[in-house]
Amino acid sequence: MKCLFLVCLCLVPIVVFSSTFTSQNPINLPSDATPVLDVTGKELDSRLSYRIISTFWGALGGDVYLGKSPNSDAPCANGVFRYNSDVGPSGTPVRFIGSSSHFGQGIFENELLNIQFAISTSKLCVSYTIWKVGDYDASLGTMLLETGGTIGQADSSWFKIVKSSQLGYNLLYCPVTSTMSCPFSSDDQFCLKVGVVHQNGKRRLALVKDNPLDISFKQVQ
């Protein structure tokens, strides 16, 4: 059964509305909103595609990619994996769709967002590009990341990018019920960390209690 979480409550009605609301300047981002940066120090742009890469090298490295889930009856590749090393294929490009996208093209730390594999695909597989968290996998004791999500869906498709305590960034899974309630909340008590588990010899992204995946972002040229 999929885990259920309480909705995040804000102390103000809508934190994305600035106290300086005027007819000339109706909406501002929170003053403490910090842009997410790529490996070159540039701010992420929702119009561009990126590869999610590891902050480490060798056997500790490896890009994130779209692959076929073991024992899945889905008609398209629907698993979110990480290569076993940074030596080898490049990862599958993604784009980030922020819940505050009406403010511009920037992507910010602690912002609720969707993640989509930015690839050409058939009509049949279009719905298998949006990330989500799947049902509980009893054999692995956790919930695995997969595709088949929905942009704006409040249950299984919301993530956050947060600064890592080590290097780069971490991903959090944050199933809140409304993007307008807390789109920039830094209270992550309702979020779970995204890390890696081993599934049939592959590294599969999944929800973890410890050792979250440390990642960076490299723009696809």
UniProtKB/Swiss-Prot annotation:
GO terms for cellular component: vacuole. The keyword Signal applies. The record marks 143-144 as: Reactive bond for chymotrypsin or HLE. Residues 19-28, 179-184 form a propeptide. InterPro entries: Kunitz_inhibitor_STI-like_sf (IPR011065), Prot_inh_Kunz-lg (IPR002160). One of its GO terms (molecular function) is serine-type endopeptidase inhibitor activity. It holds the Pfam family Kunitz_legume. Synthesized as a single-chain precursor which is cleaved to form chain A and chain B. Disulfide bonds join 76-125, 174-191. Keywords: Disulfide bond, Protease inhibitor, Serine protease inhibitor, Signal, Vacuole. SUPFAM superfamilies: STI-like. Tubers. The keyword Phosphoprotein does not apply. Residues 1-18 form the signal peptide. A motif (Vacuolar targeting signal) lies at residues 25-30. It is found in: Vacuole. The record marks 95-96 as: Reactive bond for trypsin. Potent inhibitor of serine proteases (chymotrypsin and trypsin). Inhibits tightly human leukocyte elastase (HLE). Does not inhibit papain, pepsin nor cathepsin D (cysteine and aspartic proteases). Protects the plant by inhibiting proteases of invading organisms, decreasing both hyphal growth and zoospores germination of Phytophthora infestans. Heterodimer of chains A and B; disulfide-linked. Double-headed inhibitor able to form triple complexes with target proteases, by binding simultaneously one molecule of trypsin and one molecule of chymotrypsin. Belongs to the protease inhibitor I3 (leguminous Kunitz-type inhibitor) family. The serine protease inhibitor PSPI-21 comprises two protein species with pI 5.2 and 6.3, denoted as PSPI-21-5.2 and PSPI-21-6.3. They may be encoded by two alleles at the same gene locus. This is Serine protease inhibitor 1. It comes from Solanum tuberosum.
